[in-house]
């Protein structure tokens, strides 16, 4: 089974692209959805211990947690040390299940793929991109997003140009869904002929 790592900076259209891979019959692992899941379960005690006051009704309150970590790189590192091992375990379970199902290709949707060294654990990388103007417009339309918060998020992410340079495939979401579907078909055709690279 070939594993494609899907990544892209905030607001690039990565979640939509992941859904379209799913529509094409490809198993898709969603790291963000897994974070939501562990924030409602296994990560709660460790996060409350590290960041007191960030849980409400037995769940991590993402807004409260964000206030504690978004401008503090040491706090962000502590959070990652809690969350990343849990995510790796869920990720491996997904791959085992996808392989057992006989899927020829699986997609792992990981926002910080390059930033966490995740490109070494996939066979090829798909980077989702759009113009800076469209990106900013999409992000600032989100609830609870401010220009300052956006700048702090972007400062932690590898620049889009560098991600595109390191990608095996690039999906441009600037022109609507049909062109994205066509790009996905091309990627899946190419992936069928690619050798496995991950260990």
From Swiss-Prot:
GO terms for cellular component: cytoplasm. The keyword Kinase applies. Its EC number is 2.7.1.24. Pfam families: CoaE (PF01121). It comes from the Bacteria. One of its GO terms (biological process) is coenzyme A biosynthetic process. Residues 3-199 form the DPCK domain. Disulfide bonds: none annotated. It catalyses: 3'-dephospho-CoA + ATP = ADP + CoA + H(+). ATP binds at residues 11-16. The keyword Magnesium does not apply. It is an enzyme of class 2 (transferase). InterPro entries: Depp_CoAkinase (IPR001977), P-loop_NTPase (IPR027417). It is found in: Cytoplasm. Keywords: ATP-binding, Coenzyme A biosynthesis, Cytoplasm, Kinase, Nucleotide-binding, Transferase. Pathway: Cofactor biosynthesis; coenzyme A biosynthesis; CoA from (R)-pantothenate: step 5/5. GO terms for molecular function: ATP binding; dephospho-CoA kinase activity. HAMAP family: Dephospho_CoA_kinase (MF_00376). Belongs to the CoaE family. Catalyzes the phosphorylation of the 3'-hydroxyl group of dephosphocoenzyme A to form coenzyme A. This is Dephospho-CoA kinase. The gene is coaE.
């Amino acid at each position: 089974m070939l594993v494609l790592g899907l990544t892209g900076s905030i607001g690039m259209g990565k979640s939509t692209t992941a859904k379209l891979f799913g529509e094409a019959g490809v198993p898709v692992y969603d790291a963000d959805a897994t974070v939501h899941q562990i924030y409602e379960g296994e990560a709660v005690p460790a996060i409350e211990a590290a960041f007191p006051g960030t849980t409400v009704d037995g769940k991590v309150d993402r807004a409260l947690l964000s206030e504690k970590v978004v401008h503090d790189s040491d706090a962000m590192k502590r959070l990652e040390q809690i969350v990343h091992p849990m995510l790796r375990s869920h990720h491996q379970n997904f791959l085992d299940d996808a392989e057992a199902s006989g899927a020829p290709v699986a997609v792992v949707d990981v926002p910080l793929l390059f930033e966490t060294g995740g490109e070494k654990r996939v066979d090829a990388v798909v980077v989702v991109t759009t113009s800076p103007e469209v990106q900013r417009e999409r992000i600032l339309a989100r609830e609870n997003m401010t220009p300052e918060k956006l700048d702090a998020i972007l400062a932690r992410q590898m620049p889009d140009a560098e991600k595109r340079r390191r990608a095996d495939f690039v999906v441009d979401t600037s022109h609507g869904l049909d062109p994205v579907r066509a790009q996905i078909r091309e990627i899946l055709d190419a992936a069928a002929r690619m050798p496995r690279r991950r260990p």
